[in-house]
Amino acid sequence: LGLLGLVGWIGDPVVFWRDLLDLLAEVSRQASGVDIEPLSWESLEPLAPIMAGIMASAVLVALSLALLLGTWWASGIHGGSFAAMFRNLHLGYVIGGLATIAGIAAILGLQPLAGNVLLVLGTGFAFQGLAVVYWWSWSKQWPRGWWLALYFPLFLGPAVRMSEMALLVTLGFIDNWYRLRPGREDMV
């Protein structure tokens, strides 16, 4: 909904982000010294069509992390188990249906809007995919420190990071429709 509001407010989002990224590239060129490579417009231009989705996803990540942190604090005060609640995270069929529609629309060429919506919904499924991994680690009693194998690749660069995020999104989406966690209680 916020993504649609942004599009309504700024008009054509591709033009808006293209102008903003062009300004960023120009500022980078002006600020660069001999030690740093300035940002090139060619590296930023492909981001313009999906920049609204990237920004909305970033806001969703920040809000989700704040919500998870607050839930963790509240569970510590009230004696609940945050880990159990997180392991049961499930977005539900409505969000799954919207993601399916956005995916079909993206395949049919309704870009960039469908791609941007898919980015935002994919962010939620990344959290659900992470919950699936934590559920597996808990149910299979993986050894301590297993999470290093999950989080270390995030520091290996953008290609590895995006591949891992795509895997988490896929895992979350599949779990949404076909329960990969038997006995899971639905918690949104």
Name every feature range the model reports, one short phrase each.
Residues V34-S64, S139, M162:
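Hydrophobic alpha-helical transmembrane segments
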Residues L1-D12, M51-L67, H90-G103:
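Alpha-helical transmembrane segments of multi-pass integral membrane proteins
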Residues A56-W73, L121, F125-G129:
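Hydrophobic, lipid-facing residues on alpha-helical transmembrane segments of integral membrane proteins
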Residues G70-H78, Y134, W138:
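Membrane-water interface at transmembrane helix exits
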Residues G79-Y134:
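Small-residue-rich helix-loop
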Residues Q111, L118-V188:
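Long, positively charged, glycine-interspersed low-complexity recognition regions
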